[in-house]
Amino acid sequence: MIQGVIFDMDGLMFDTERIWATLWEPALAGLGLSYKEGLDEAARGTAGDSMRAVLRRFYGPDCDPDRIIEALHEQGVIAFQAPPPKKPGLDELIAYLEAQHIPMVVASSSRMASILRHLNNWHMTDHFQALISGEQFSASKPDPEIFLLAAEKLGTDPAHTLVLEDSYNGVRAGAAGGFVTVMVPDLLPADDEMRGLYTMECTSLNEVLAKLKTGEL
């Protein structure tokens, strides 16, 4: 039985990943660098040392990953002045979980300022027991540490805690932590690796809600 739910944010709650994917080129161009194919996919869902490792892999050990990350986030502040669209089924899922007295946490690789901006724009902050940002950790997703802290905030065992994720790195983190991990794909479909890791794949948050109601989750 599910006793708590952990939400990723970008690409799961809000339709933001498509926008982030377009921000790499201007961010890198401002630093005299060009976008390299596969960077967005490799970096998606990461933060901190995990993202730095990705950037060094693409741009070499002598690159300044923090400068690139800061340039990317500067582009994000401009791009997200208007609230991004909510994913279909988000409001209904949250309402159901609240009615069932199932606590919820947001655990995102994004900066806390970004998490607060999106949630406050939609007046959603009060629905969650805690908000956890990847910038709080040296190792973010695919390391499970962020989800383990979320479970601690919920007061639930990972085996009875649902992780909702769209990214490969998020699914890897959920599986590594022993969580009930459901992938709701956004930009990238599930591949063989993901199918070997997740508990279930759902096409939308509406399907997650349906599975909870029928007891399949």
Enumerate the language-model features and the residues they cover:
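N-terminal helical cap/lid subdomain that shapes the substrate entry/recognition surface
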Residues: 2-100
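Residue-level detector of anion-binding/catalytic polar loops
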Residues: 34, 103, 180
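Conserved G/P- and acidic residue-centered "switch" motifs that form tight phosphate/ATP-binding loops
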Residues: 8, 12, 108, 166
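Functionally critical, cavity-lining and gating residues within the transmembrane helices
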Residues: 48, 108, 112
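Structural motif
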Residues: 42, 107-109, 164
